[in-house]
Regions:
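Structural and coupling elements of P-loop NTPases
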Residues: 1-614
Length: 614
């Protein structure tokens, strides 16, 4: 079989923050790709602002490095299972993977998730043990953990015989030996291992064209762009080709531009052939999973199966009294268009209409997946309201089932009991408990996804920020009956509109924890605090102190107010109950009741109580 020895196509897969993006940066620096004296910023492949802030990779990036007359096409994939749709698409474009594992933390749930996807595609693995210079690093033990994981996931004999390279990407060093003293300031061992181990792509350029779209992009000048791999044949600018749609239909179009990848740039090219990773423009409604084929011999590549969404939320137009004040895009049409556009590029996302023309059911792979979408919309200038995340139930063999996840926790020993107790209350079942080094314990649980909604805040508080938790979808199993997780405490709800006063807050704070600062504008039905008891309380938070001729109202009370709690977006979503919304604008995140009017809310509560007594 003829191959193209000048090309290697690889993906980098790893758990969140194990250093894969830093590794790609170092490969760019040390290859023949960038001009001399050219400096690249840290985490260069993370172009999305949210990715930079959170230190996670959401969207797959592709780049290419030149080394010893070879072009190594590198795809950087997300390390979080919530973005698994991206991982699965990338696996179809490559012939091998670099599995990056932290020399201290070892294998983690998301490492398992992405590795499983790679092994299922029969890709050739290279294991990179990164951060070998980290305090407490245990590279040899971690290699054993990786081998155990390969065996557990059903790797074949060839995959089990994986080469290992030890690196410190932050320092730009690597070695074939686990001893940190053997590290040299070069990535040559890694480059050489890639060239030697990863199979070269098959060269069937003389056969009819097949190009598979794996990632979508958009450019104001050329419109929609399909990024993928040429699996067969050749493609040139000006060619008349056929787009094989997912619904079975065919559309002919002319290739207007082709782009190749070099370093961090996308450069125009005139021709590409089997094995190349390229971008194609010329067809406005091209979608992920579709095939660009030879016009005379059109043949589609089997579409990719993506794991289904497990979590859903209602997204709706903002109808609070403050609607339209802070956002640029506030109408139902604008929000719907943006959500539908997101669905075109994110194959893990599903957007469905509801009976309400101003609301949509948005389904995704997890809390992080959906919260990143909300944060993106917010930064783009959108206003919206969102409901509490809910799991997606499925009927399997006539039995109603819900999603369960594997939860892996590393916590200081003194918090182990509290963590076990808290997860047990959320119907988690402990599968394993391993005492680790440095006073740490590793816990493995199987827990229902709905029990994990809102758990991360509780977990971080419980472990004083020292605990590390990650979880990944495991399976659907029969629904746990007669159990309703969620916030157990009630809320403090504003009874009127105005500005919150220090004087009023002093009288209210004994009822619970305040969530806003003095001077914050509020409206009727807005949540201003968490009650210390189970019921909701309506409060007058705008009440002013009568002025005297001695001093102005509120001037001397500030020192007596406990510091209010300020929630992040994720914490706000976790806080919500069924009768509440989170109002999201470019400037603020507010919590509110679905029914704003106090009297209407009380009537609804009476009806619910009466119904429950029947």
């Amino acid at each position: 079989m003829k191959t193209r020895d000048d090309i290697r196509n690889i993906a980098i897969i790893a758990h969140v923050d194990h250093g894969k993006t830093t590794l790609v940066n170092e490969m760019l620096k040390q290859s023949d790709t960038l001009p001399e004296h050219f400096s690249i910023e840290d985490r260069a492949m993370d172009t999305n602002a949210i990715e930079r802030e959170r230190g996670i990779t959401i969207l797959s990036k592709n780049t290419a490095v030149k080394y010893d007359n070879h072009q190594i096409n590198i795809l950087d994939t997300p390390g979080h299972a919530d973005f698994g749709g991206e991982v699965e698409r990338v696996m179809k474009m490559v012939d091998g993977v670099l599995l990056v594992v932290d020399a201290f933390e070892g294998t983690m749930p998301q490492t398992r998730f992405v590795l499983k996807k790679a092994l299922e595609q029969h890709l050739t693995p290279i294991v990179v043990i990164n951060k070998v210079d980290r305090k407490g690093a245990r590279p040899e033990e971690v290699v054993d953990e990786v081998l155990d994981l390969f065996i557990e996931l059903g790797a074949d004999e060839d995959q089990l015989d994986f080469p290992v390279v030890y690196t410190s990407a932050m320092n730009g060093t690597s070695s074939y030996d686990s001893d940190v003293s053997t590290q040299e300031h070069t990535m040559k061992p890694l480059f050489d291992t890639i060239i030697k181990t990863i199979p070269a792509p098959v060269d069937n350029s003389d056969e009819p064209l097949q190009f598979k779209v794996a990632i979508l992009d958009y450019n104001d000048f050329v419109g929609r762009i399909g990024i993928g791999r040429v699996f067969r044949g050749k493609i040139k600018v000006g060619d008349n080709v056929t787009l094989m749609k997912l619904d079975g239909s065919k559309k002919n179009f002319r290739v207007t531009k082709l782009f190749g990848f070099f370093g961090l740039k996308r450069l125009e090219i005139n021709e590409a052939e089997a094995g190349d990773l390229i971008a194609v423009s010329g067809m406005e409604d091209i979608n992920v999973g579709e095939t660009v084929a030879d016009a005379e011999h059109p043949e589609a590549i089997t579409p990719l199966r993506i794991d289904p969404p497990t979590l859903q939320m209602t997204f709706r137009t903002n109808d609070s009294p403050f609607a339209g004040r802070e956002g640029k895009f506030v109408t139902a049409r604008q929000l719907e268009d943006r959500l539908k556009r997101e669905m075109q590029t994110d194959v893990s996302l599903k957007v469905e209409d509801t009976d309400d023309p101003g609301a949509w059911t948005v389904s995704g792979r997890g809390e992080l997946h959906l919260s990143i979408l909300i944060e993106t919309l917010r930064r783009e200038g959108y206003e919206l309201s969102v409901s509490r995340p809910q799991v997606i139930y499925r009927e399997i063999d006539g039995v109603m089932s819900e999603p369960f996840e594997e939860v892996q926790i590393d916590t200081p020993d003194e918090y182990t009991g509290a963590v076990i107790d808290s997860l047990s209350k959320r119907k988690g079942e402990m599968k394993n408990m391993e005492p680790g080094e440095n006073g740490q314990t590793r816990l493995i649980f199987l827990a229902p996804s709905r029990g994990l909604i809102g758990y991360s805040t509780e977990f971080m508080t419980m472990t004083r920020g020292y605990g590390i938790m990650s979880h990944t979808f495991e399976k659907y199993a029969p629904v746990i009956k007669n159990w309703n997780p969620g916030r157990q405490k009630g809320t403090l709800v504003s009874m009127n509109a105005g500005k919150a006063t220090t004087y009023a807050m002093m009288g209210i704070e004994s009822r619970g924890q305040l969530l806003i600062d003095p001077g914050t504008e509020v409206y009727e039905g807005m949540i201003v605090g968490e009650n210390s008891r189970e019921n909701d309380i309506t409060v007058n938070i705008t009440k002013g102190k009568n002025l005297t001729n001695v001093r102005a109202a509120g001037s001397d009370e500030m020192a007596h107010i406990k510091t209010p709690t300020h929630f992040s977006l994720e914490e706000s979503l976790e806080f919500l109950n069924e009768d509440e919304y989170c109002e999201v604008t470019p400037e603020n995140i507010r919590l509110r009741k679905k029914t704003l009017n106090t009297n209407a809310r009380e009537k609804e509560a009476k009806r619910r109580r009466a119904a429950s007594r029947k």
